[in-house]
């Protein structure tokens, strides 16, 4: 039997968002403890308390991926300025990876970014996220110079022209 996959706005399921954000950030801090400093710079504790505020329409977005009703992935979009936005918090639970969910989440957020009127989307993954980095490249993201204040030396910086 095929699973039912739904990509939906997450504003009415913030407890699911928080759980996925926590799993995502725990994974990153495990790979590089310096990532905790970056989370602090980003005021992550505030974001976790009120995730909808940072990613609210009309300039932002927040989505969940559900498989058979279960929240298994997330993605967010935030405004940097009038022409640039940033993809944040792309995460799919390990047992659901390899099913194309990350690709679906990215497609949804890039469609929204185009509709909002952004000209490009930026993101700053860690190289340890090899599968994600490979996917970003496949989807047309390319490396750019540093665009933020990440203290994690290994951070990569990508852009997608919309």
Predicted regions and their residues:
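Conserved acetyl-CoA-binding loop-helix of GNAT-fold acetyltransferases
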Residues: 92, 98-111, 134, 138
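Conserved GNAT-fold acetyl-CoA-binding loop/helix
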Residues: 5-11, 22-51
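Conserved acetyl-CoA-binding loop of GNAT-fold acetyltransferases
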Residues: 118, 137-145
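A short helix-loop-beta-strand connector motif used in the catalytic cores of GNAT acetyltransferases and
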Residues: 47-64
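Conserved beta-strand in the GNAT
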Residues: 64, 70-79, 86, 91
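Conserved GNAT acetyl-CoA-binding A-motif
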Residues: 113-125
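Conserved beta-strand-loop-alpha-helix junction that forms the acyl-donor binding cleft
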Residues: 94-97, 122-132, 149-154
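A conserved beta-turn-beta hairpin within the catalytic core of GNAT-like acetyltransferases
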Residues: 57-58, 79-88, 97, 116, ...
